[in-house]
């Protein structure tokens, strides 16, 4: 399973670890992914999503029905 948020599309980015001597070694910054079940009242079922904490806040703000509609327009299977 790829480390991509289903709502926001956030994915890992690369950068550097920096030691005290400012030596650089490559590293990955991973998104804060959580697996969460949401109850969709209009469909009378649970939907399981892999999303970031920010994605959960977006669902709290807009509502699960609107977010699922936006995901389906993008071609995401839900």
Swiss-Prot record:
Keyword Ribosomal protein: yes
Disulfide topology: none
Top-level taxon of the source organism: Bacteria
GO terms for MF: structural constituent of ribosome
Keyword entries, A-Z: Ribonucleoprotein, Ribosomal protein
Any one GO biological process: translation
Keyword Protein biosynthesis in record: no
One GO CC term on file: cytosolic large ribosomal subunit
Region (Disordered): 1-20
Family: Belongs to the bacterial ribosomal protein bL28 family.
HAMAP family listed in its UniProt record: Ribosomal_bL28
Protein name: Large ribosomal subunit protein bL28
Organism of derivation: Photobacterium profundum (strain SS9)
Gene designation: rpmB
